[in-house]
Amino acid sequence: MEEYKEIMQNKKGKVDVTPIANFFREEVKQQITKNCWKPRVVAFLTSDDQGAIDYSKWTKLACQKDGIEFILKRVERVDLEDLIIEANNDSCVHGILVYYPVFGGMMDSYLQDVVSPTKDIEGLSTQNRFNLYHNIRFMDGETATKKCVIPCTPLAMVKIIDNLGIYDKSLAMGEHLKGKTVTIVNRSEIVGRPLAAMLANDGAIVYSIDINGIIIFQSGKRHGTIKMSETNVTREEAISKSDILILGVPSPNYKVNSDLIQDGTIVINFAGCLNVDESIQEKSILVPTIGKVTIAMLERNLLRLFNNQISNK
């Protein structure tokens, strides 16, 4: 994008992702207007967590502004499963969004699978995650008319990296990040692990770090497969050799030492708190927040599912 040309040339500075988010939201808005579509989302909020409440407000405002009917329901968590099933069976509902955590742990994983994959705008169901890890692009197999959805936050970061001009489109599909080293400090099933798989699928070597250690993600021998391997590389070594560093530790006490980060590294932060000192922008490229692009990807996923559903009628 032209907005980032100077930052990328200088290999330092702070990136505001608003232009990227606006680009994709404008695409969504144009499709809705052109086709006279009326997509509807039902979102469930069970928590009093201020972060979840704020995110639900931002999502609702963005969707309504872009022509999406957004119904936000404050519900008791013990009632959530029945309400999700009700929304699954409602033909007027095209997307379902749950603000996690609800119970936490395996109970939340269960709820993610209660949401029908055909309405799972977050892409968190087992089927959607299986499709991602096996690079399956369509929900209807060889018919290839119903596109899969990808988890919103990982997809947002891929789009940010792409719009910063890091993807080499002159290379073959699956090699656009060939020669790039990425470190992700987060291996959650919602963000870190799917993101590692996506970037590895695009040709990068990915160091995936969590409290249990480091795993390397690379593209496998067969197209669309991922190879995982153990490594003796330390956290500090992985960070210091990275072209792209992605941080997602939900603690204000976690900070990466700026001395470990090489000049010109792209540092993307998706945690609610900044996992690196803001002064890193004086020698590297800092993307401090990605939330606006995540919401844009949510809208994009909704339209994909809406289109899949109306094609059945």
UniProtKB/Swiss-Prot annotation:
<dbReference type="InterPro" id="IPR020631">
    <property type="entry name" value="THF_DH/CycHdrlase_NAD-bd_dom"/>
</dbReference>
<feature type="active site">
    <location>
        <position position="152"/>
    </location>
</feature>
<dbReference type="GO" id="GO:0006730">
    <property type="term" value="P:one-carbon metabolic process"/>
</dbReference>
<keyword id="KW-0560">Oxidoreductase</keyword>
<dbReference type="InterPro" id="IPR020630">
    <property type="entry name" value="THF_DH/CycHdrlase_cat_dom"/>
</dbReference>
<feature type="binding site">
    <location>
        <begin position="210"/>
        <end position="211"/>
    </location>
    <ligand>
        <name>NAD(+)</name>
    </ligand>
</feature>
<feature type="binding site">
    <location>
        <begin position="187"/>
        <end position="188"/>
    </location>
    <ligand>
        <name>NAD(+)</name>
    </ligand>
</feature>
<dbReference type="GO" id="GO:0009113">
    <property type="term" value="P:purine nucleobase biosynthetic process"/>
</dbReference>
<dbReference type="InterPro" id="IPR046346">
    <property type="entry name" value="Aminoacid_DH-like_N_sf"/>
</dbReference>
<dbReference type="InterPro" id="IPR000672">
    <property type="entry name" value="THF_DH/CycHdrlase"/>
</dbReference>
<comment type="similarity">
    <text>Belongs to the tetrahydrofolate dehydrogenase/cyclohydrolase family.</text>
</comment>
<comment type="pathway">
    <text>One-carbon metabolism; tetrahydrofolate interconversion.</text>
</comment>
<dbReference type="Pfam" id="PF00763">
    <property type="entry name" value="THF_DHG_CYH"/>
</dbReference>
<dbReference type="InterPro" id="IPR035812">
    <property type="entry name" value="m-THF_DH_NAD-bd"/>
</dbReference>
<dbReference type="GO" id="GO:0005829">
    <property type="term" value="C:cytosol"/>
</dbReference>
<dbReference type="InterPro" id="IPR036291">
    <property type="entry name" value="NAD(P)-bd_dom_sf"/>
</dbReference>
<dbReference type="GO" id="GO:0004487">
    <property type="term" value="F:methylenetetrahydrofolate dehydrogenase (NAD+) activity"/>
</dbReference>
<dbReference type="GO" id="GO:0006164">
    <property type="term" value="P:purine nucleotide biosynthetic process"/>
</dbReference>
<dbReference type="GO" id="GO:0004488">
    <property type="term" value="F:methylenetetrahydrofolate dehydrogenase (NADP+) activity"/>
</dbReference>
<protein>
    <recommendedName>
        <fullName>Methylenetetrahydrofolate dehydrogenase [NAD(+)]</fullName>
        <ecNumber>1.5.1.15</ecNumber>
    </recommendedName>
</protein>
<keyword id="KW-0658">Purine biosynthesis</keyword>
<dbReference type="GO" id="GO:0035999">
    <property type="term" value="P:tetrahydrofolate interconversion"/>
</dbReference>
<keyword id="KW-0520">NAD</keyword>
<feature type="binding site">
    <location>
        <begin position="270"/>
        <end position="272"/>
    </location>
    <ligand>
        <name>NAD(+)</name>
    </ligand>
</feature>
<comment type="subunit">
    <text>Homodimer.</text>
</comment>
<dbReference type="Pfam" id="PF02882">
    <property type="entry name" value="THF_DHG_CYH_C"/>
</dbReference>
<keyword id="KW-0554">One-carbon metabolism</keyword>
<comment type="function">
    <text>Catalyzes oxidation of cytoplasmic one-carbon units for purine biosynthesis.</text>
</comment>
